[in-house]
Amino acid sequence: MMMKKQALNPYLPSWEYIPDGEPYVFDGRVYVYGSHDFYNGYVFCMGDYVCWSAPVDDLGSWRYEGVIYPRNEDPENKEGKMCLYAPDVTVGPDGRYYLYYALDKLPIISVAVCDTPAGKYEFYGYVHYQDGTRLGERAGDEPQFDPGVLTEGNVTYLYTGFCGRGDKSRTGSRVCVLDRDMLTIIREPETIVPGIEYAAGTEWEGHSFFEASSIRKHADTYYFVYSSEVMHELCYATSDSPLGGFHYGGVIVSNCDLHIDSYKPADMPAAYGANNHGSIVQIGEDWYIFYHRQTNGSWYSRQGCAEKIVIKEDGSIDQVELTSCGLNGGPLVGKGTYPAYLACNLFTDRPSAYIGGDGYPKVMQDGKDGDEYDGYVGNIQNSATAGFKYFDIQNVSSITITARGYASGVFEVRTKWDGPVLAELPIAYTNVWEDYTAPITIENGVHAIYLTFRGQGNCHLKSFELK
């Protein structure tokens, strides 16, 4: 029997940038629908919608399904000048697949349809009131953004919203009900989770709704997943009704790992975060949260990641930490070569929760967007740390790193970010990739690997190998 590939984080190739992932299981495969960033992009969501899928029993083997919907398919965007923002998909009463989305410059929700999960979607129509007025264009409507959809029987629940600080015209995430035609509103929008301007003194204060509405159902409970006012969190709320009565549940994941105290202080960010968007999905017996991370020191080159979660008997979900092995079902093999772009922790001796600092390490790639080159960690300066979690270490006696750059100094190897140094790897000035090896002793068991640079200059880290 062929060995299955290990499942890595990010789960797609390092040259692919699919944020805002909405995961679904159809016919034994996991499909992820998201927006499409570019490497070195200058705005969000510059690409057409593409889809990737994987067998539910082999989450390391992702297949590119191709472009499922080009931006100029929408009649309002024939010249392709507007971007396709984060979409969602639902199966309608007729068994077809309906793709809901918003264009970046319009306040409305568009819908496309396809007979298969990842075929060629065709424009279908716009969500509208019974008089034909498009949702978002009636007096008093809030602009539509980040649709989340759930179909039950002959009706579909549509959740949308965006709430920035200081804008009282945006109330929160709002839900309306669509008829079996998937377009016509039969119950008008109502706010279910407040934005920051309406959260003071409520259970939502500090974690009010910002964007990224997503809805799932587990047993008899509806889970509303959303990005909170601090942006880097994906939070959840629960209700026994899709139409309201939601109560704040907690944070599921933060893309800077804030609040996690299992390996660091809770208030220490361990990655460079920004906005976040994703949802939960059951794959086999397990549940996962899909989210995205930022790369290239930019808001506009985001990549999908996932972590295993546990929905407890009382319906609650504890926050999970960022790892390099999210879909793997356990730690990665503790021997072999691993690319540096798998770093789930990136920080310096001055940690920051948000991207953008000139001195921050960042995941990068050579070439232009679409070039199928493995990523690496670049802009590594003094005190920069890259962390990788987790590995099942067995009888490892040496570590090799592959690095380049005009820098001199050493990489320190640890199994805890603040633990003892287990090996040092001196590097030299070079503009080509060079290997550096050192002996190391690591106790057998499950460990992280942390690589910290101490020295002068700026270097890149391509990979490390455990032997």
Q: Which residue stretches match the model-derived regions?
A:
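Carbohydrate-active catalytic/glycan-binding domains of CAZyme proteins
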Residues: 1-424, 428-467
